């Protein structure tokens, strides 16, 4: 395939995301990493800004030899209409052949548009999920560190993401 999308919120980007992106690169000439919910930030579900997520992804992807040539990162704001979401992506992004996702709804929407919908093998699914990482950070517990690329781990500490999540949790 020429070009595949990897869609996610990347809150924060973790090793499961890296595994999925590498898997997609094994199946396409190019991959567009779509940073979804780009308009969201400073909430428990979406604590990082789109710019912070793009920067963290770049730090993580720099380990790949040809990442600049084969990867693009595109922040995309949400729309509240699933039926037209793939068309919305077609309007915002260069042409693509399909998506790589573990999300059933995303796969269904792409299949319904006649596009490839590929499910990657899961990587430490229960352990390295954004939800678990954010929950551990918000509660001040350890265990999230091993799910992040070392560069991303340093970056989220530098921007104070664990403290941001604790403060957001207190505001609830």
Curated annotation (Swiss-Prot):
**Pathway membership:** Cofactor biosynthesis; NAD(+) biosynthesis; NAD(+) from nicotinamide D-ribonucleotide: step 1/1
Q: Which BP terms from GO are recorded?
A: NAD biosynthetic process
Q: Name one GO molecular function term.
A: nicotinamide-nucleotide adenylyltransferase activity
The EC number of this protein is 2.7.7.1
- Which residue ranges run through the membrane? none
Alphabetic keyword roster? ATP-binding, Cytoplasm, NAD, Nucleotide-binding, Nucleotidyltransferase, Pyridine nucleotide biosynthesis, Transferase
Family according to the record:
Belongs to the archaeal NMN adenylyltransferase family.
Instruction: Please report the name of this protein according to its UniProt entry.
Output: Nicotinamide-nucleotide adenylyltransferase
Query: Which organism is the protein's source?
Result: Aeropyrum pernix (strain ATCC 700893 / DSM 11879 / JCM 9820 / NBRC 100138 / K1)
